[in-house]
Amino acid sequence: MNVSQQIGPRAAASERSMADAIRFLSMDAVEKANSGHPGMPMGMADAVTVLFNRFIRIDPSHPDWPDRDRFVLSAGHGSMLLYSLHHLIGFADMPMAELSSFRQLGSKTAGHPEYGHALGIETTTGPLGQGISTAVGMAIAEQMMAARFGSALCNHFTYVVAGDGCLQEGISHEAIDLAGHLKLRKLVVLWDDNRISIDGSTDLSTSMNQLARFRAAGWDAQAVDGHDPDAVAKAIERARRTRKPSLIACRTRIGKGAASMEGSHKTHGAALGEKEIAATREKLGWPHPPFFVPPEIKAAWEKVATRGRTAREAWEIRLDASRSKKRYEQTVERKLDGEVGDLLARFRGAHRTRATKVATRQASQMALEVINGATALTIGGSADLTGSNLTLTSQTQPISPGNFKGRYLHYGIREHGMAAAMNGIALHGGFIPYGGTFLVFSDYARGAMRLSALMGLPVIYVLTHDSIGLGEDGPTHQPVEHLAMLRATPNLNVFRPADIIETAECWEIAIGEKNTPSVFALSRQALPMLRRTDGNENLSALGAYVLREARGDRDITLLATGSEVEIAVAAAERLQAEERIAAAVVSMPCWEKFEAQDAAYHRQVLGDAPRIAIEAAGRLGWDRWMGPDSAFVGMTGFGASAPAGDLYRHFGITADHVVAEALELLRRACPETPPIGARTGKPVAHIVRSSEEA
């Protein structure tokens, strides 16, 4: 017997009233808030009622049950559809009072669904296309968990409701293509095919045959009347049987049921108004006051929770009987073995002894070789730059269609899709995803990276070729503004390590984060090992530290990150040797970690001498660390095509230029007398900077 038959032959009649409950709760909430989107919940109420009433397995009393079906509202503007469902099936944190507080400060019912803000919200949606793309990652994770633990412990579907806007966004193409290639058979997308956009009919801007598009990408695709419950049920049954991901085009009318506005784009993003809602109540035979659901309809909806609870209890019996129970639970919880930190400490000690000189992208791969050998939680990948990002290790065999036992995803040239899929993998649980591309192409992934931070997901972005140091590929590939953009993002750790020691330290931090994503900005060019002091303390965890202390009281402090720390050290040594100026060097591998330290530590590291910041990127953001008497050595515009060494000299990011800036800073600090070294009394030479250097 299939799932839908279990509901009985009279299901369709009761489902009409169940769907109307969604419609009126959505209308009432938007009306009270005078803000929101009633049209989509009203239009998709019939199809979603069938999905929940006949198929989906979730248990509101255990919203994090690992083998639950996932429901993703990609068209997040229709959030009242989700909140209404959660109230009706009995989520504890979604009483009627929350629905009547829709879009108000402090309520659980935010304008768009927010992960972690209310129970049962699988992912934050709102930026169109993100939900369907994140769902691809969830479906990948489900297949990977099933490959490791079997269908007895992992056997669930990922259902998505997507709108026209989701399918128009470019990220959807990346996600659809990847899902079809991987044959993600547990992914089912219900498309709200209402042919309405904010501006009016969708034929204003598109003539796309979406069914043909999905079929070309390897999906099963069907078209049904979205207001015919039995037709929707048959389509879902077929989708659950196919060996491909599935699209069900639900032909709907936006604002379905509205007395005079049904089918109008005016129902998309505004309250219907008291008169229209009153007329709709009369039209649909719903005589109840706002925010009221008759007990018999609420009871019908609560059967969804009963079915989910029964499924969960059966699953728990299987888990208890499984010999893999402990390993399964540790995997779901992403519990890292404490050995990882010890192994990385030994790794740092070994390379400190050897004074290993490598590009930080290579240092990252070497650290990953240690990490991936110590834990099976990590899932790597790259957007077609594996050989450049160096994200593949000996333990991470590729995942391919039909084979999900591997630990490495070839995402193709789909940076945005990769980032969203990693969000989905992290949200699903069981894995720590990392993926690589060039730093400059973080622009392409920006929307999903922002959601990583907003949701607090342990996703790791390995972004290599982080400056003009990549050389001949030129300004299209040389990031300038990207570090500033990433550092401006709340709850995102941006690591730019200076050598192999810092790289390993930063990986130790990133792999242990629970609620913060990480970015690694890594060099193409080889960098010397600068940290030669013994000790296992992870100094990068402090965000910044004094790498080279001044000899005596500081005359000047040089601040730098990544590949420019080498330049700062060379400049400090020259200032000491040639000018007897006491210069300290501060390495700042992670601003966010440094900002989290107390004021006393800030003063200890930064000191009170004039400061020079050195970074082969734009200045934006550096002033918070530089202080009033300061200078910046870095980029003021785009790069150029040339060998890396030539570019550093051309743009003045050299030890010579840093020395000149230091002397000029000290001269300006004492305009009436030549500046002198703090301890020696030796006059500092007068420097006149060329216009190019200035």
From Swiss-Prot:
Full protein name: Transketolase
Pfam families: Transket_pyr (PF02779), Transketolase_C_1 (PF22613), Transketolase_N (PF00456)
Task of the protein: Catalyzes the transfer of a two-carbon ketol group from a ketose donor to an aldose acceptor, via a covalent intermediate with the cofactor thiamine pyrophosphate.
Family note: Belongs to the transketolase family.
Coiled-coil residue spans: none
Catalytic activity field: D-sedoheptulose 7-phosphate + D-glyceraldehyde 3-phosphate = aldehydo-D-ribose 5-phosphate + D-xylulose 5-phosphate
Top-level EC class as recorded in UniProt: transferase
Annotated Mg(2+) binding sites: 164, 194, 196
Keyword Chaperone attributed: no
Pathway: Carbohydrate biosynthesis; Calvin cycle
Assembly and interaction partners: Homodimer.
Record-annotated active site: 415 (proton donor)
Matching InterPro entries: THDP-binding, Transketo_C/PFOR_II, Transketolase-like_C_2, Transketolase-like_Pyr-bd, Transketolase_bac-like, Transketolase_BS, Transketolase_CS, Transketolase_fam
Catalytic activity, EC: 2.2.1.1
GO cellular component: cytosol
Cofactor note: Binds 1 Mg(2+) ion per subunit. Can also utilize other divalent metal cations, such as Ca(2+), Mn(2+) and Co(2+).
Gene Ontology molecular function, alphabetical: metal ion binding; transketolase activity
Lineage: Bacteria, Pseudomonadati, Pseudomonadota, Alphaproteobacteria, Hyphomicrobiales
Gene behind this protein: cbbT
GO terms, biological process: pentose-phosphate shunt; reductive pentose-phosphate cycle
Kinase in keyword set: no
Annotated positions binding thiamine diphosphate: 77, 126-128, 165, 194, 268, 441
Organism the protein comes from: Rhizobium meliloti (strain 1021) (Ensifer meliloti)
PANTHER family associated with the record: TRANSKETOLASE, TRANSKETOLASE 1-RELATED
Site positions (Important for catalytic activity): 37, 268
Cofactors: Mg(2+); Ca(2+); Mn(2+); Co(2+)
Database matches in SUPFAM superfamilies: Thiamin diphosphate-binding fold (THDP-binding), TK C-terminal domain-like
Binding residues annotated for substrate, in chain numbering: 37, 268, 361, 388, 465, 473, 524
Gene3D superfamilies: 3.40.50.920, 3.40.50.970
